[in-house]
Amino acid sequence: MDKTSLIGIILAFVALSVGMVLKGVSFSALANPAAILIIIAGTISAVVIAFPTKEIKKVPTLFRVLFKENKQLTIEELIPMFSEWAQLARREGLLALEASIEDVDDAFLKNGLSMAVDGQSAEFIRDIMTEEVEAMEDRHQAGAAIFTQAGTYAPTLGVLGAVIGLIAALSHMDNTDELGHAISAAFVATLLGIFTGYVLWHPFANKLKRKSKQEVKLREVMIEGVLSVLEGQAPKVIEQKLLMYLPAKDRLKFAEQGEAQNGEKKEEEA
């Protein structure tokens, strides 16, 4: 599970609850069925109108992506894999990688290696893999757009709910107590609209965009790795090239780990 999503939501509700207590607001004030209906049902309705059915059906999948930790290869794991494959390909030829392909779980990487072993040109492989990444990125952007739009609609619907509440409040002009209660209830819709829009929907969209960028970056590393192996580049050259995709701090850490492993190997050989 992606703990940051869950922790963020919990902290948001805690912050709202503590703020209400400090301001002396009763939790029962939020129990406003009309406001909840306007915000939740209104937001859902607006999103359904704005997007085609095919994209709306993917919403449950988007929630799984939000709350599920991605179990993907990391760049740190890919670098030694490509170094090993490059060494094998230089020593025995690309066909020697056929056995290694079976051990690859990532479908994108497996397809790239298969095309390389089949003798496809570097340009063809780059075009195919790049187009696949672009198509994936478009799908991800479409999913994030649903939550972005929901975050845009919710606060506006909150204003709509407040206006409806104020219209209802005007019917109690002859009763000061009822008028005050009606006005406070009118702004519950605004609170819910702003809260769901800027604490849930917009952050959800941002999380999807960040996860998409991470996956795109990983795919770019795979493309460069496959093409480098195809071109017969030295393992050390491939390692240095792919390390550029890591932050400086992670590159240094990777280098230190590599030196430690080399030291252990020398001790074993001695």
Swiss-Prot record:
GO terms for cellular component: plasma membrane. Its main location: membrane. The lineage of its organism: Bacteria, Bacillati, Bacillota, Bacilli, Bacillales. This is Motility protein A. The chain crosses the membrane at residues 4-22, 36-53, 153-173, 182-203. Belongs to the MotA family. It is found in: Cell membrane. Keywords: Cell membrane, Chemotaxis, Flagellar rotation, Hydrogen ion transport, Ion transport, Membrane, Transmembrane, Transmembrane helix, Transport. The gene is motA. It comes from Bacillus subtilis (strain 168). Signal peptide: none annotated. Pfam families: MotA_ExbB (PF01618), MotA_N (PF20560). GO terms for biological process: bacterial-type flagellum-dependent swarming motility; chemotaxis; proton transmembrane transport. MotA and MotB comprise the stator element of the flagellar motor complex. Required for rotation of the flagellar motor. Probable transmembrane proton channel. Residues 204-270 are cytoplasmic. InterPro entries: Flag_MotA_CS, MotA-like, MotA_ExbB_proton_chnl, MotA_N. Each stator complex is composed of 4 MotA and 2 MotB subunits. 2 A subunits and 1 B subunit are thought to form a single ion channel, so that each stator complex contains two channels. The keyword Nucleotide-binding does not apply. It is a multi-pass membrane protein. NCBIfam families: PRK08124.1. It comes from the Bacteria.
